[in-house]
Amino acid sequence: VAGMAASKLLILEGISGTGKTSLPYSFSRYLYNPATIVSVQPSYRDRSELLGYFNEFSKRFNETEFLRALYEANYREEPTLIVLDEMNLARIEYYFAEMLSVLEMPSKDEWVLDLVPTAWEGDPVKMDGGKIHVSDATWFVGTANNDDSTFTITDKVYDRAMPIELNERADAFECDPQPACYVTT
């Protein structure tokens, strides 16, 4: 939780089976807003994998689960967690570069992503002029395995993130269900 105060991008890294994905998922359920889990694919090469793209043939924007989560976060007060599961299966700088740049902007008013060059009549309400605002209540949590099937996370990414190492498997335990906690940012 303290890492969320330091950065909008948390990276949970370590060996398989340490709960890197289930930790943010469980935490977000506790906050009354289940996380969106995006499974990063080795084929991710650019921003369209996360943000979608405008199809010139159909004249429609093909949105992604990631983009829907960003959009919905603009309607919520609760913290929104978007989990990039196994984020280093592809080069992070390729598909997440624009988001890294946006989150570095000093003013939250500048946290805006250009999705399409011109606005269309059917654009969602929170998409203004083909752009979408990244809510201050949004955090990105990347999970990363350290093995031969993954890419090394570069200093460019580490400089903008709060890395947390999880290298030991914990013993399973039982606990009583707890009521969710309502938190706003």
Regions found by a protein language model. Name each.
Residues 1-184:
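AAA+ P-loop NTPase catalytic core and its hallmark functional loops
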